[in-house]
């Protein structure tokens, strides 16, 4: 299932949730490194996205990005937001509320182009559970909610 950022997706089954939790637990064990690796891959593959992060200006190489405390801080926030979504899979109202708040911030305060949510979600999915339809469905749910304020 390709990741989408509009419309709706079917609810996650119990089997999908269990598979997501198992895959995510493995990734989240080293969340700081994983988060930085994901964000570095995102910025090196999508350099235009870096314009939305003034603190990352001048960080032109993967090594520069990895060594930046600002990048590490933001990577941790992203990973923890996904972790919150994984923990909230059984309480979609809670997940929705948190992600809609993030959507408002990104749309109205940071002016982030919403297309980047889908790109980043793809990298997270490929890092966590490559080709897993359930994880891609969760990433779609996250993208749809993050796009809600646009």
UniProtKB/Swiss-Prot annotation:
A GO molecular function held by the record: oxygen binding
Alphabetically ordered keywords of this record: Heme, Iron, Metal-binding, Oxygen transport, Transport
Tree of life domain: Eukaryota
SUPFAM superfamilies, per database record: Globin-like (SSF46458)
PROSITE patterns in the record: GLOBIN (PS01033)
Annotated Globin domain residues: 11-150
Residues reported to bind heme b: 74, 106
Gene3D superfamilies: Globins (1.10.490.10)
Subunit: Monomer.
Similarity section: Belongs to the globin family.
Entries under PANTHER family matching the protein: CYTOGLOBIN (PTHR46783), CYTOGLOBIN-1-RELATED (PTHR46783:SF1)
Protein name per UniProt: Globin-1
């Amino acid at each position: 299932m390709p990741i989408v950022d509009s419309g709706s997706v079917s609810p996650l089954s119990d089997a999908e949730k269990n598979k997501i939790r198992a895959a995510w637990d493995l990734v989240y064990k080293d969340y700081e490194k994983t988060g930085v690796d994901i964000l570095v891959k995102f910025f090196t593959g999508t350099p235009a996205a870096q314009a939305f992060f003034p603190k990352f200006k001048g960080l032109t190489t993967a090594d520069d990005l990895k060594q930046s405390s600002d990048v590490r801080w933001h990577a941790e926030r992203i990973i923890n937001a996904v972790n919150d979504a994984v923990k909230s899979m059984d309480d979609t109202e809670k997940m929705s509320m948190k992600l809609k708040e993030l959507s408002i911030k990104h749309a109205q305060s940071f002016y982030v182009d919403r297309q980047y949510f889908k790109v980043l979600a793809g990298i997270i999915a490929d890092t966590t559970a490559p080709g897993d339809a359930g994880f891609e469905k969760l990433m779609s749910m996250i993208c749809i909610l993050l796009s809600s304020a646009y």
